[in-house]
Amino acid sequence: MLRTCDITHIKNNYEAIIWKGERNCSTISTKYPNSAIFYKKRFIMLTPELGFAHSYNQQVKPLYTFCEKQRHLKNRKPLTILPSLTRKLQEMKFLPASDKSFESQYTEFLESFKILYREPLFLQIDGFIKDFRKWIKGEFNDFGDTRKIQLEPFQKNILIHVIFFIAVTKLPALANRVINYLTHVFDIEFVNESTLNTLKQKTNVFLVPRRHGKTWFIVPIISFLLKNIEGISIGYVAHQKHVSHFVMKEVEFKCRRMFPEKTITCLDNVITIDHQNIKSTALFASCYNTHSIRGQSFNLLIVDESHFIKKDAFSTILGFLPQASTKILFISSTNSGNHSTSFLMKLNNSPFEMLSVVSYVCEDHAHMLNERGNATACSCYRLHKPKFISINAEVKKTANLFLEGAFIHEIMGGATCNVINDVLITEQGQTEFEFFRYSTINKNLIPFLGKDLYVYLDPAYTGNRRASGTGIAAIGTYLDQYIVYGMEHYFLESLMTSSDTAIAECAAHMILSILDLHPFFTEVKIIIEGNSNQASAVKIACIIKENITANKSIQVTFFHTPDQNQIAQPFYLLGKEKKLAVEFFISNFNSGNIKASQELISFTIKITYDPVEYALEQIRNIHQISVNNYITYSAKKQACSDDLIIAIIMAIYVCSGNSSASFREI
């Protein structure tokens, strides 16, 4: 006979032993931070790492995030602390708390925190994440192949949606704690509360182009859920019987190969993994036999190729919506040429943000794929393409030869777009360019800045301010980004002045001012456009060099182009590369790779006018012109010229290219 207290003691010891190998051991410090506090109770907060502290520490985001992240790390590496900080910390003295009850409160609080790490369902979720991490690292591959698996963004999104919902429904009492843990595991601390609520909602729709690994990714999700989450019930519905049968056999094969120690059965389209006290099941059905899913209590229902599911079967699937513990994932490709097979796109207007669309073209530029013969990507180029996907002009031509419109409808993804919108510059890009500027005289930033200054000069020999002026732009690099150091939009005061001298002095004045503020530049590379007047371009180059070398000891080189006699001259002839330069600029601008310096130099733009805002006005005017299937770009509008923006675009384009051999001294 055992006494009750002995039974409890033995049970606790037994559980501690059997969980020892699997448990994600808590790294919470058990040492009581004994420090006195001198403020009211309502201002006190209690955390495992800080003990009793003032509640304003919750607003110190780096501190609070660091504490939470360290709390969830299993094997923490020793932290490296600067010696000066160590000395300062050692000098700090804390008075011990006089109230002994604080220590008992802290101990009780710590025990409540450790409940999560002892919760069996938490250990199951953690086991699922560990197995998935091993699979990504290639540890489950056959024949010694240890190559890592690279997940696409939409696949990561599906994984997070699945595990977040299961965590919330399986552990409702500890939902906030486990969600906090998962945000650290998946490294998504930056997401806000609204996004977290989206991850936890019951229904989500993923529309992804064909051949991108939708069905392939479902197999490991089902396999690892069956292995780790005890008692889970999964449903899988496909548009064809052979698809559901194939997925079922793949799941069975992977489970038997990866988990040979588990008891696995496959009978009547149901795969079962037998745990000690309960079974985990996955049922596979086609839309022609939805009777098998009626009356089930799924935790996860995956509807593959949802756009091609019979409408009668959809009624049965939607019957699971009222079930609070069921997550429904609609995953499908899109035939956007047919509204009957793209009806899920209507959810784009849903207030619940349940629709995620993967496409190679945004709605603003979908029409351009038809207008441009060889175009195969969105003109804003915010694109992530897997390495196993090849989309080029030949693929487009071949697809459209078989079936008119097949390229845009079957391959590119997205929805039928009847709205034509020629907006090339995104609002996000404009906002980032206007407000996020680097301080290029910051000593911590200087080591990462490029040591070459590129200056593009587009001269205009007219005094008509309504026509055009001289655009000058100075560009440098910061890692893979481009920084605007200076810009000028110069108009001749009158035709009586020497236009060559005035333009050259304006450019030299800007360059010298930039060099005064940024002495780290070792070379100035100047590009003078010679399309209007080659002789004047050569004269401008000579005057600029004379002005700079008289004031600064720095190497000055000019872009050289062979003339009719094959003699290299210091000017640049702008040709068809202007189109490529504009597209390169648009892609980098929209991706946030073009920034302005806080110490930007400009003498010709009014003091009351921010030069960056002045440049933005011209950037917003960039538009596409299509004439006889030939595409070009312009930023000219009725009351606005494009001289400055063309200079910026070309300076960035030349800076990005491998054109060092074309720069020579004169």
UniProtKB/Swiss-Prot annotation:
GO terms for cellular component: host cell nucleus. It is found in: Host nucleus. Keywords: DNA-binding, Host nucleus, Hydrolase, Viral genome packaging, Viral release from host cell. GO terms for biological process: chromosome organization. One of its GO terms (molecular function) is hydrolase activity. A motif (Walker A motif) lies at residues 208-215. It is an enzyme of class 3 (hydrolase). Its EC number is 3.1.-.-. Interacts with the terminase subunits TRM1 and TRM2. Interacts with portal protein. Belongs to the herpesviridae TRM3 protein family. Component of the molecular motor that translocates viral genomic DNA in empty capsid during DNA packaging. Forms a tripartite terminase complex together with TRM1 and TRM2 in the host cytoplasm. Once the complex reaches the host nucleus, it interacts with the capsid portal vertex. This portal forms a ring in which genomic DNA is translocated into the capsid. TRM3 carries an RNase H-like nuclease activity that plays an important role for the cleavage of concatemeric viral DNA into unit length genomes. This is Tripartite terminase subunit 3. The gene is TRM3.
